[in-house]
Every structure is written in structure tokens, then in C-alpha cells.
């Protein structure tokens, strides 16, 4: 399979190894050698990713043939380490000498080369400095925390596969003397923004790095305020045992205080209970009542995203109808098709048909069939008490609902002409107050 890589990429040291081009020294001098390792990088050319069977025989040879002759020629007037010249005797081979030499997975890959694009593995370069067994030096270091003996699935015969890591490429150990800690620090800082590109990087920190910054749960202490009957004498002494979870508190109250079926009196002895010793008819009613004191709500809404919890299963059953849209309670009045989700809403609605007005205003003699109407009426009293002292008719809020008499313009003009300016202004003010009061009564 052939891969046409397209344009020239001298910055990452990729060259057209298989091409038969020849370059003069003048052409080489014009190139900007600082962009890459190989100054002859005209383009990526054709990469043969799957070597043939006859190519596997040369697996013992060098996997990456250096282009040092051109490198040395291009660096003619520059200062460079003397070991660079050791590569001048290497032959100019094709792309297959650069890429994979074996289909099997090698285990000689160094751990520091697992996250680079072109990383030389152990024994890849033999040099005069005795680094034949050294690992490739990574120009852009990634996460290199794995053990050296652990084989990476991206290593093929000591060479890193042309992968999709976030790091760019690796240099041989012999080139390591050219770099400096300052340049490596700069490269690491510049590569920090490419973290999202690296699809082969393992999550070394795990979930701990995230949970470290989560808010720690506040430890709550739940106190039992049950008072035993034999300790009701002054001063009263409550249980005062503390618990860290609601389950422990509820279990303690149920087992130690409420008791089993042998208990005949189902009385709540919680501290400052408003029932004041009034018994329940059944044990389950006492258990449900104790949830008012403990705050237990063991019935959560099963619908996702709701998050509401309830102390009684009956309340949960009614609440679920808001999600399902079920309205099983139909109005019993003939000809009315209104339906309701619970019986209490239906009972409030029935007052419309029976003309019952059980909701009385405590400030006046008005009564209404629905509590919402009473709440609207109470706003009339609130607004009148907050404002300036208006006329008695406007402050009462329950005057006659008869609309005011419509006055013709001629009559109004005659009345205005017969009054003095001051009395005329007072007359208009009183009329306006009466209209406002009556309109408020209409909206109630």
C-alpha cells in the first residue's frame, strides 16, 4: 500500500528516500537546514507501509539510514559536534530502510520513545560514543513513565510506528549532545498545547487527579432527640446519640424507641413534638410521623432529572402523575369534564358547582370558592395598607360590585362649572378613587 504524503515537510525530518534526485552543494546551501535533520527533504514522497517478504531479510541492518553527507555539506560553515561526521559513510537507501523492518512486535523499545513520531529504539544507531544500546532521545518529550521492559503496541522491530501521537519526532542519542536542558524545557512548554492531539497517551494519573479537586462532603451529625417515658420528669433528658448517616439514625429510632409489635401505645416522644403525647392508631402512622423530625425522605422520584424525594409513598405516587400526565379524578358534577391528578384539587374545584365559599377573608366579609381567589383578594388589603390613607370606599375592598353610573360629558361639564377649582379637583380625585376601587373588585 502506497501513501502519498503530499507537500514538503522538512521540519520533521521526513525525506523522499526513494527518489533518484541529486542535488548540488549550491542547492543544499540555499536550504534552511535549521528546520530539520535532513536538508534533502523535498517531500514525503511515497511511504511503503507494508514491506515485502524479500525486505524482511535485511532486518538486522540499520533501520534508519542517516543522511549525514548532505547534512555535513549543508553545515559547512556551522559549528557542529564531531560525531556528526560519523554518519557520512552511511549509504543512501530507500524508504523501506527508514520504515518497518519486521511485522512482529519488538520488545526492545525504550520507554522514553513510546510517545514520539520517529523514535530510534535500542541498537538503532551504532556510534563511536558507545550508545549502541541507548534509547532514542526524544526532542519533544511526552509521558514517559511506563516501565522500560513493557512493550508498546506501536513498536515494530525497534522502530516506532508512524503513529498519531501528540509528540513530533525523536532524535538519536548521538544527537542528544546538540540539545540542552533549556531547549528541552522550551519544547516541552510549546508542546503542552498539543495534549488533545495525542490519542495514544495513557491516563497515568487516573481519576484521582479529578477527585482531588472535588469538594469534600460535609460530615453531618444526626442527633436522636427521643425522650424515654421514664425520663419525662423535669429536667427532661433526651437520647442524644449521634449518627453519621440517616440510615443509622432511622434504624436506631425504629429498633430502640418505637419498638416491635409488642408495643401497644404508638406515641411520639420526640423532643418538642407538637402532638404532645397524642397516640397514633397504628405503628406505620407513627413511623411516617417520625420522618417529620428526622428529615428522612426514602422515596425518590424515578424519573431522570427530577431529583425530588418524598417522605410518604402516597406523595410520590401523586407527584409521578405530573410526569405521566395522568388525571384519574374526574369532576362528579354532571356536564363538567374537568379532571385532576389528586382528590384534593378536585374537592377545591367542586365548590364552583355547589356555590360553597369556604375560604373567608379575615379582614372583611368576603368569601371565595378557591384559595387562589382569596389570595388575589388579600392583595387589595395589602396595597391599601401600604399606600397613603385613601377614601373609606377605596380601603374597604368589598363595596358594591355595581359599576359606577356613566356620566355624560354635558353633565360632567355642568358639574365642573358649578364647582370651584379646588372643589372640582377634589371631585375628580374622589371619582377616580371610586373607579379604581370598583375595578379592583371586578378582578377579584
Swiss-Prot record:
<dbReference type="InterPro" id="IPR043359">
    <property type="entry name" value="GLI-like"/>
</dbReference>
<keyword id="KW-0862">Zinc</keyword>
<feature type="compositionally biased region" description="Low complexity">
    <location>
        <begin position="383"/>
        <end position="432"/>
    </location>
</feature>
<dbReference type="GO" id="GO:0008270">
    <property type="term" value="F:zinc ion binding"/>
</dbReference>
<feature type="region of interest" description="Disordered">
    <location>
        <begin position="372"/>
        <end position="432"/>
    </location>
</feature>
<dbReference type="InterPro" id="IPR041643">
    <property type="entry name" value="Znf_ZIC"/>
</dbReference>
<dbReference type="GO" id="GO:0005654">
    <property type="term" value="C:nucleoplasm"/>
</dbReference>
<keyword id="KW-0805">Transcription regulation</keyword>
<keyword id="KW-0963">Cytoplasm</keyword>
<keyword id="KW-0221">Differentiation</keyword>
<feature type="zinc finger region" description="C2H2-type 3">
    <location>
        <begin position="299"/>
        <end position="323"/>
    </location>
</feature>
<dbReference type="GO" id="GO:0007417">
    <property type="term" value="P:central nervous system development"/>
</dbReference>
<dbReference type="InterPro" id="IPR036236">
    <property type="entry name" value="Znf_C2H2_sf"/>
</dbReference>
<dbReference type="GO" id="GO:0007389">
    <property type="term" value="P:pattern specification process"/>
</dbReference>
<keyword id="KW-0010">Activator</keyword>
<feature type="zinc finger region" description="C2H2-type 2; degenerate">
    <location>
        <begin position="271"/>
        <end position="293"/>
    </location>
</feature>
<dbReference type="InterPro" id="IPR013087">
    <property type="entry name" value="Znf_C2H2_type"/>
</dbReference>
<dbReference type="GO" id="GO:0008589">
    <property type="term" value="P:regulation of smoothened signaling pathway"/>
</dbReference>
<comment type="function">
    <text>Acts as a transcriptional activator. Involved in neurogenesis. Plays important roles in the early stage of organogenesis of the CNS, as well as during dorsal spinal cord development and maturation of the cerebellum. Binds to the minimal GLI-consensus sequence 5'-TGGGTGGTC-3'.</text>
</comment>
<keyword id="KW-0677">Repeat</keyword>
<dbReference type="Pfam" id="PF18366">
    <property type="entry name" value="zf_ZIC"/>
</dbReference>
<feature type="zinc finger region" description="C2H2-type 5">
    <location>
        <begin position="359"/>
        <end position="381"/>
    </location>
</feature>
<dbReference type="GO" id="GO:0042472">
    <property type="term" value="P:inner ear morphogenesis"/>
</dbReference>
<dbReference type="GO" id="GO:0030154">
    <property type="term" value="P:cell differentiation"/>
</dbReference>
<keyword id="KW-0238">DNA-binding</keyword>
<dbReference type="GO" id="GO:0006357">
    <property type="term" value="P:regulation of transcription by RNA polymerase II"/>
</dbReference>
<feature type="zinc finger region" description="C2H2-type 1">
    <location>
        <begin position="222"/>
        <end position="257"/>
    </location>
</feature>
<dbReference type="GO" id="GO:0000978">
    <property type="term" value="F:RNA polymerase II cis-regulatory region sequence-specific DNA binding"/>
</dbReference>
<keyword id="KW-0804">Transcription</keyword>
<dbReference type="GO" id="GO:0005634">
    <property type="term" value="C:nucleus"/>
</dbReference>
<protein>
    <recommendedName>
        <fullName>Zinc finger protein ZIC 1</fullName>
    </recommendedName>
</protein>
<dbReference type="GO" id="GO:0021510">
    <property type="term" value="P:spinal cord development"/>
</dbReference>
<keyword id="KW-0479">Metal-binding</keyword>
<keyword id="KW-0863">Zinc-finger</keyword>
<comment type="similarity">
    <text>Belongs to the GLI C2H2-type zinc-finger protein family.</text>
</comment>
<dbReference type="InterPro" id="IPR056436">
    <property type="entry name" value="Znf-C2H2_ZIC1-5/GLI1-3-like"/>
</dbReference>
<dbReference type="GO" id="GO:0000981">
    <property type="term" value="F:DNA-binding transcription factor activity, RNA polymerase II-specific"/>
</dbReference>
<keyword id="KW-0217">Developmental protein</keyword>
<dbReference type="Pfam" id="PF00096">
    <property type="entry name" value="zf-C2H2"/>
</dbReference>
<keyword id="KW-0539">Nucleus</keyword>
<dbReference type="GO" id="GO:0005737">
    <property type="term" value="C:cytoplasm"/>
</dbReference>
<keyword id="KW-0524">Neurogenesis</keyword>
